């Protein structure tokens, strides 16, 4: 739904006066082709709606007197509601469990086994944690079917999915997605107070999501968790994605309630995107900005030149059109690299709040490019000339054939480095040339609030090669 008179779509809430049947969440994404169905589902639309709603709230605000209000971390301009404070207490208790679970002695090939002990503690404590955090009318909202479960079964699924995989001892964007969905489920159950547009959303981001990310970083560092579904050097980040979305919004141009989310520009005094490559800038900005907070964590756990271990983020730091351009690109990339990737969404489960049912206005995906990472029921023919490849998404989207082969001697230089460049960062453009465009939010009557990457122009000519490989210009490219 759209907020009255505002260019923003808002995640709908349940009407308490109407019946609702809750469902035990179930796995629906079992093969690559199921991702296409997911991208047409009500769950997908609701996830993107909630993400865009939160994103908009983090842009600086134009005040009636002409001043600009920004939303840095730990700002006193944001007051937390009672539900947000309850969620903060929940996170604090999980942190206490972390402190009370020391590392196991010995050598571990992957993550330390104490992670599984901590994970078991969180699971055991979940019923009481949710009961203390959420009002009974939210947690135990009944189904209209007398034999149906309460809302607790759906809330528990998304909450437990937020803390990494006990079996694989890893953490990635799929777990981050589960926490976002947990908060979205509370929203749909009317668990957050009604307020002016953006007010409560802002408290959710600053008061719950950022503390959650900080807690997860502590878990990752303590137990040395593996990244789940990482693209390696070609990925954006080994573990997280949403801090780059909200953090770039924090530095975007100021907007009023009637403005559309901007696609270019920055705050007049915003730090330059190139600041991510400067350690002193990162240390300063990580205290006030979510984007730089995530960059700071990368610097904490990775060694070597930033451009070498985080090439995607290094490339993005060369964007000249401002933080709003980066924000738009991040949302597009989240859609393509998280929600459209089988390895990420295969573990997501669907109930009534985030439903597998098809959205009536869904537009079928134009390409199967995002499903190629998953198993298929029908074998696909591989051309005899095709060489073995590590898989979709592991190669930089802008890489050419000549770039795919690493330098023969050093082994540590950037893939595009030449013998003259040595170990120095490249001096050519760092802007990726293309990314998959998998936008799916429908146009129609709500065109002003559709996904920010959606184009009103007709599609261009089909690319050469595989007709299924539909790509568009990178969101931050000029």
From Swiss-Prot:
Q: What is its EC number?
A: 5.2.1.8
Q: Which GO terms describe its biological process?
A: mitotic spindle organization
Q: Where is the composition biased (Low complexity)?
A: 396-419
- The segment annotated Disordered runs over 359-478
Which GO MF terms does the UniProt record name?
peptidyl-prolyl cis-trans isomerase activity; protein tyrosine phosphatase activator activity
- Is the Nucleus keyword given for this protein? yes
Q: Which Pfam families match?
A: PTPA
Stored InterPro entries: Phstyr_phstse_ac, PTPA_C_lid, PTPA_sf
Q: Which reaction does it catalyse?
A: [protein]-peptidylproline (omega=180) = [protein]-peptidylproline (omega=0)
GO cellular component terms attached to this protein's record: cytoplasm; nucleus; protein phosphatase type 2A complex
The UniProt record lists the keyword Transcription regulation: no
Q: Which family does it belong to?
A: Belongs to the PTPA-type PPIase family.
Q: Which PANTHER family match?
A: SERINE/THREONINE-PROTEIN PHOSPHATASE 2A REGULATORY SUBUNIT B (PTHR10012), SERINE_THREONINE-PROTEIN PHOSPHATASE 2A ACTIVATOR 1 (PTHR10012:SF3)
Q: What protein name is recorded for this chain?
A: Serine/threonine-protein phosphatase 2A activator 1
What is the native source organism of this protein? Aspergillus oryzae (strain ATCC 42149 / RIB 40) (Yellow koji mold)
């Amino acid at each position: 739904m759209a907020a009255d008179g505002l260019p923003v779509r808002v995640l709908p809430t349940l009407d308490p006066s109407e019946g609702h049947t809750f469902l035990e969440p179930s796995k629906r994404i079992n093969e690559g082709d199921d991702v296409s169905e997911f991208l047409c589902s009500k769950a997908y639309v609701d996830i993107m709606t909630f993400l865009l709603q939160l994103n908009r709230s983090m842009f600086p605000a134009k005040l009636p007197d002409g001043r600009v209000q920004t939303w840095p971390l730990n700002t006193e301009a944001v007051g937390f509601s009672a539900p947000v404070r309850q969620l903060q207490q929940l996170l604090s208790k999980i942190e206490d469990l972390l402190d009370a679970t020391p590392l196991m002695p010995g050598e571990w090939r992957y993550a330390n086994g104490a992670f599984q002990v901590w994970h078991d503690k969180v699971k055991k404590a979940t019923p009481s944690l949710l009961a203390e955090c959420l009002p009974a009318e939210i947690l135990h909202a009944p189904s209209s079917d007398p034999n149906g479960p309460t809302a607790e079964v759906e809330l528990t699924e998304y909450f437990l999915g937020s803390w990494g995989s006990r079996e694989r001892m890893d953490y990635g964007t799929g777990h981050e997605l589960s926490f976002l969905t947990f908060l979205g489920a509370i929203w749909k159950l009317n668990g957050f107070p009604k307020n002016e547009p953006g007010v409560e959303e802002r408290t959710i981001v600053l008061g719950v999501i950022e503390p959650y990310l900080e807690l997860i970083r502590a878990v990752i560092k303590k137990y040395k968790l593996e990244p789940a579904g990482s693209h390696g050097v070609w990925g954006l980040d080994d573990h997280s994605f949403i801090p780059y979305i909200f953090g770039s919004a924090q530095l975007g141009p100021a907007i009023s309630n009637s403005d559309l989310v901007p696609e270019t520009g920055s705050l007049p005094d915003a730090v330059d995107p190139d600041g991510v490559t400067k350690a002193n800038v990162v240390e300063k900005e990580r205290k006030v900005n979510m984007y730089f907070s995530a960059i700071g964590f990368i610097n904490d756990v990775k060694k070597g030149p930033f451009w070498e271990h985080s090439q995607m983020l290094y490339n993005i730091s060369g964007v000249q059109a401002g933080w709003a351009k980066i924000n738009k690109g991040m949302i597009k990339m989240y859609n393509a690299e998280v929600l459209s990737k089988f390895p990420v969404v295969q573990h997501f489960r669907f109930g009534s709040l985030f439903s597998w049912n098809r959205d009536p206005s869904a537009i079928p995906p134009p390409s199967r490019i995002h499903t190629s990472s998953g198993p298929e029921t029908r074998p696909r023919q591989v051309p005899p000339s095709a060489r073995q490849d590590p898989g979709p998404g592991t190669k930089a989207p802008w890489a050419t054939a000549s770039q795919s082969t690493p330098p023969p001697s050093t082994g540590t230089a950037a893939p595009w480095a030449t013998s003259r460049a040595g170990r120095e960062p490249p001096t050519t453009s760092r802007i990726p040339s293309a990314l998959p465009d998998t936008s799916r939010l429908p146009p129609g009557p709500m065109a002003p609030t559709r996904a920010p990457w959606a184009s009103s122009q007709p599609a261009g000519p089909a690319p050469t090669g595989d007709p299924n490989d539909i790509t568009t210009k990178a969101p931050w490219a000029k």
